């Protein structure tokens, strides 16, 4: 039995970024949304306008904060931001494209591909370090809302770490979880036990999609 419903979280990845076509290591680099990224969350705001949410959270980087603000404007909520919810830090790679990293740091991309979870760029983080930063803040937010429906807008790596933690997926396997720009994930707690009800895909978000309507209800 699932037990009594508690906190319900709509966990989004931010919208498409202004430099998305370059495939960059954004990390803590504070890039904004592209026009498409803005439209993605204008669309989500329209879809969710009949829903009611207690609070709205994001990282303090503009790509998540601005994404959250589109929903917040419809809901009358201002995003509460936390630096702990930032993406993995890529250190000296921050803001660089894959080709720039390959030119500037020969051989490091190959090293990263051998073990993405544990690779650490100079001045950056590993995924276990990201997990150690994110999960306590996530659990703190959940504890604040034992019976509320809330929204979180985070990053691809952050969402994978959260979902992997809830599903007991080893950290080196979390990349099996797909997180497109503007993806929706739904987490429902029952007597303090989390159930991941939905792992989303950006291609699915449309008011006509029954799957989305079911997921947010």
Descriptions of predicted regions:
Residues 17, 158-159:
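Short active-site segment of divalent metal-dependent hydrolases/proteases
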Residues 2-4, 43-109:
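Phosphate-coordination/substrate-recognition cap region in phosphate-metabolizing enzymes
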Residues 10, 80-82, 197:
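General small-molecule cofactor/ligand-binding pocket signal
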Residues 1-8, 88-103, 143-148, 165-217:
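Acidic, low-complexity terminal tails and accessory targeting/binding regions
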Residues 155:
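Short basic (Lys/Arg) and small-residue
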Residues 21-24, 107-121:
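Short, basic/glycine-rich phosphate-binding loops at helix/coil junctions
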């Amino acid at each position: 039995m699932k037990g009594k419903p508690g906190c319900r979280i709509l966990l989004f990845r931010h919208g498409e970024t202004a430099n998305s076509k370059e495939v960059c290591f954004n990390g803590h680099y504070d890039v904004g949304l592209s026009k498409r990224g803005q439209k993605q969350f204008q669309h989500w705001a329209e879809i969710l306008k009949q829903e009611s949410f207690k609070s709205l959270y994001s990282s303090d980087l503009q790509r998540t904060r601005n994404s959250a603000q589109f929903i917040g404007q419809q809901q009358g909520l201002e995003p509460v931001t936390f630096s702990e919810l930032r993406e993995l830090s890529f250190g000296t790679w921050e803001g660089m494209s894959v080709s720039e990293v390959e030119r500037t740091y020969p051989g490091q991309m190959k090293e990263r591909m051998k073990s993405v979870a544990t690779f650490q760029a100079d001045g950056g983080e590993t995924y276990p370090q990201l997990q150690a930063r994110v999960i306590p803040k996530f659990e703190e937010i959940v504890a604040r809302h034992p019976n509320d429906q809330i929204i979180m807008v985070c990053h691809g790596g952050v969402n994978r770490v959260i979902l992997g933690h809830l599903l007991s997926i080893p950290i080196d396997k979390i990349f099996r979880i797909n997180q497109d720009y503007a993806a929706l994930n739904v987490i429902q707690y029952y007597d303090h036990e989390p159930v991941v009800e939905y792992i989303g895909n950006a291609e699915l978000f449309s008011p006509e999609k029954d799957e989305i309507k079911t997921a947010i209800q």
